[in-house]
Amino acid sequence: MTKVGLRIDVDTFRGTREGVPRLLEILSKHNIQASIFFSVSPDNMGRHLWRLVKPQFLWKMLRSNAASLYGWDILLAGTAWLGKEIGHANADIIREAAKHHEVGLHAWDHHAWQARSGNWDRQTMIDDIARGLRTLEEIIGQPVTCSAAAGWRADQQVIEAKEAFHLRYNSDCRGAMPFRPLLESGNPGTAQIPVTLPTWDEVIGRDVKAEDFNGWLLNRILRDKGTPVYTIHAEVEGCAYQHNFVALLKRAAQEGVTFCPLSELLSETLPLGQVVRGNIAGREGWLGCQQIAGSR
């Protein structure tokens, strides 16, 4: 039996309003629990359109057929008009998710984090995280114990900033296995649970065709030598490609693959490492990558 951490990122208003309820129903039918990370501020995701001037981002949008994948309401949110508030406007949905799944913070403002956090000072970052945690805790009525940086935009600055909140774990980077990042003080920090597997939009039209994706992904899972963690998005697998996701769950069960919340992947003893800026194929811009202590 192969155990895979299932992480669900919720980036937008429509992903929360439409995608999350569908995913909750799907997961319930398959008796699966996951870790769901919510963005809670007004939805400004459409402001990413300026990135179309970057060839790598433009190619990603074209090969993944972004207009049909996400919808124009997502692609234009927060551009010509004020974005819709996500968190409190969808409080009932978020509370329902928290009844059955592990719920954590993705971001206060997903667009702002992904576009600007790399240039923030530490206090600005702490204030932004605190605002998001406070809002999410108001909604679910209980402490938030985990987080996952939007767009995997994380480095040592993010690691240090999140220490102020004493979370159980963070999932801020890409890598191979859970670890504890070394702090500036030399002490180990809050556990990190990296995502190890590519997302749909990173590989469709580049490495694999849509109709072949499930088999391709399961092959990657079964060959994974670390601790497999897979990320889906409420805007993709909860909307346009929910049927593909259902087919994946059915095929995974047949092949002895089970899914679980990320916290179930933690152990008392974890290796030490760092989160450094790096790049991966299929994703524009830098993102946090796991580096095992002593490696270069």
UniProtKB/Swiss-Prot annotation:
EC number: 3.5.1.n3
Alphabetized UniProt keyword annotations: Antibiotic resistance, Hydrolase, Lipid A biosynthesis, Lipid biosynthesis, Lipid metabolism, Lipopolysaccharide biosynthesis
Domain NodB homology: from-to ranges: 2-260
Pathway terms, separated by semicolons: Glycolipid biosynthesis; 4-amino-4-deoxy-alpha-L-arabinose undecaprenyl phosphate biosynthesis; 4-amino-4-deoxy-alpha-L-arabinose undecaprenyl phosphate from UDP-4-deoxy-4-formamido-beta-L-arabinose and undecaprenyl phosphate: step 2/2; Bacterial outer membrane biogenesis; lipopolysaccharide biosynthesis
Single Gene Ontology MF annotation: hydrolase activity, acting on carbon-nitrogen (but not peptide) bonds, in linear amides
Catalytic activity: 4-deoxy-4-formamido-alpha-L-arabinopyranosyl di-trans,octa-cis-undecaprenyl phosphate + H2O = 4-amino-4-deoxy-alpha-L-arabinopyranosyl di-trans,octa-cis-undecaprenyl phosphate + formate
Recorded superkingdom: Bacteria
InterPro entries: ArnD, Glyco_hydro/deAcase_b/a-brl, NODB_dom, Polysacc_deacetylase_ArnD
Intrachain disulfide bonds: none
CC per GO annotation: membrane
Family matches, as Gene3D superfamilies: Glycoside hydrolase/deacetylase (3.20.20.370)
Pfam family, one: Polysacc_deac_1
Record flagged with keyword Lipid metabolism: yes
GO biological process: 4-amino-4-deoxy-alpha-L-arabinopyranosyl undecaprenyl phosphate biosynthetic process; lipid A biosynthetic process; lipopolysaccharide biosynthetic process; response to antibiotic
HAMAP family the record matches: ArnD
Function per UniProt: Catalyzes the deformylation of 4-deoxy-4-formamido-L-arabinose-phosphoundecaprenol to 4-amino-4-deoxy-L-arabinose-phosphoundecaprenol. The modified arabinose is attached to lipid A and is required for resistance to polymyxin and cationic antimicrobial peptides.
Family per record: Belongs to the polysaccharide deacetylase family. ArnD deformylase subfamily.
Protein name per Swiss-Prot or TrEMBL: Probable 4-deoxy-4-formamido-L-arabinose-phosphoundecaprenol deformylase ArnD
Organism: Shigella dysenteriae serotype 1 (strain Sd197)
Gene that produces this protein: arnD
